[in-house]
UniProtKB/Swiss-Prot annotation:
Record function comment: Catalyzes the phosphorylation of the position 2 hydroxy group of 4-diphosphocytidyl-2C-methyl-D-erythritol.
Residues annotated as binding ATP: P91, V92, A93, A94, G95, L96, A97, G98, G99, S100, T101
Active site (UniProt): K8, D133
The protein's Enzyme Commission number: 2.7.1.148
Name assigned to this protein: 4-diphosphocytidyl-2-C-methyl-D-erythritol kinase
Enzyme class: transferase
Species per Swiss-Prot/TrEMBL record: Clostridium botulinum (strain Langeland / NCTC 10281 / Type F)
Gene3D superfamilies: 3.30.230.10, GHMP kinase, C-terminal domain
Any GO BP: terpenoid biosynthetic process
Keyword Transferase found: yes
Length: 280
């Protein structure tokens, strides 16, 4: 069984506190985009086997797709295994939920193969044990995600919007970025309410003005390349530009495909991983 595993971007990312167990409390507006990996799963007699077209992708429990399959098989006492083939298109360690969306897609395919009556809500319970972005990736679309990612409220779909996405030639550790964030020193927070209102009113310029990611407080200071990419996007006609998730991917939001294509061509001269895509 073959399925697409779509990446996500953040239209906003706010950190509003930190729990005693170390988890940060988040308020994020998440959006699925039309950039995806391909996941194919076949039922086998035993074990979990991961195949991938990228040699650097781990094939063991470090891979979230493996973890998803293992949790699913254990939870439902399934006495067989799966072979998972992953074709990667989403950049790795990029703030685009590449591993999380693969895991979510594995859960959905395995439901179809083994336990078709399981609800999305039940899948999200398993998903939260894998990672904060995985529950959102079960549903996709446009949603406000709060807590540690478990509180998901769907809003009007912000679909068919034009994006150019740049992944610079380095990856970032989500854990390291959050560990270097000083919550008490976040002085400007996203106006998430205004951002949602702008989406509901189809006001693209207001959406662009209200996009904000507090993790840029960490990354923009350390990686000047990210400042340069954001500035280049605005110079090349983007309505707004922001880092997605914990980075380092940066996207520009456009209202015109010709401008987006010119921007893409320009960025492609400087960076290897550049994409034109849309929200879905």
């Amino acid at each position: 069984m073959l399925s697409k595993a779509h990446a996500k971007i953040n239209l906003s990312l706010d950190v509003i506190g930190k729990r005693k167990d170390g988890y940060h409390l988040l308020k994020m507006l998440m959006q699925t985009i039309d950039l995806y990996d391909l996941i194919e799963i076949k039922k086998i007699k035993k074990d979990i086997i991961i195949d991938c077209d990228r040699e650097y992708i781990p094939k063991d429990r470090r891979n979230l797709a493996y973890k998803a399959a293992s949790l699913f098989l254990d939870r439902y006492n399934i006495d067989s295994g799966v072979r998972i083939n992953i074709t990667k298109n989403i950049p790795v360690a990029a703030g685009l939920a590449g591993g999380s969306t693969d895991a979510a897609t594995v859960l959905k395919i395995m439901r179809d193969i083994f336990e078709p009556d399981i609800s999305n809500e039940e899948l999200k319970e398993i998903a939260l044990d894998i990672g904060a972005d995985v529950p959102f990736c079960i549903e996709g679309g446009t949603a406000l995600c709060e807590g540690i990612g478990e509180k998901i409220t769907s809003i009007k779909n912000f679909k068919n919007q034009i994006l150019v996405l740049v992944k610079p030639n380095f990856g970032l550790s989500t854990k390291d970025v959050y560990n270097n964030l000083k919550v008490e020193k976040i002085y400007i927070h996203p106006n998430t309410t205004k951002l949602i209102q702008s989406i509901e009113e189809d006001n693209l310029e207001s959406v662009a003005r209200n996009m904000r990611n507090v993790l840029e407080n960490v990354t923009l200071r350390k990686y000047k390349t990210l400042n340069s990419i954001k500035s280049n996007f605005i110079e090349l006609g983007a309505l707004g530009s922001m880092m997605s998730g914990s980075g380092p991917s940066v996207f520009g939001l456009f209202d015109d495909m010709l401008k987006a294509q010119i921007c893409y061509d320009n960025m492609k001269e400087k960076y290897k991983e550049v994409f034109i895509t849309r929200t879905i």
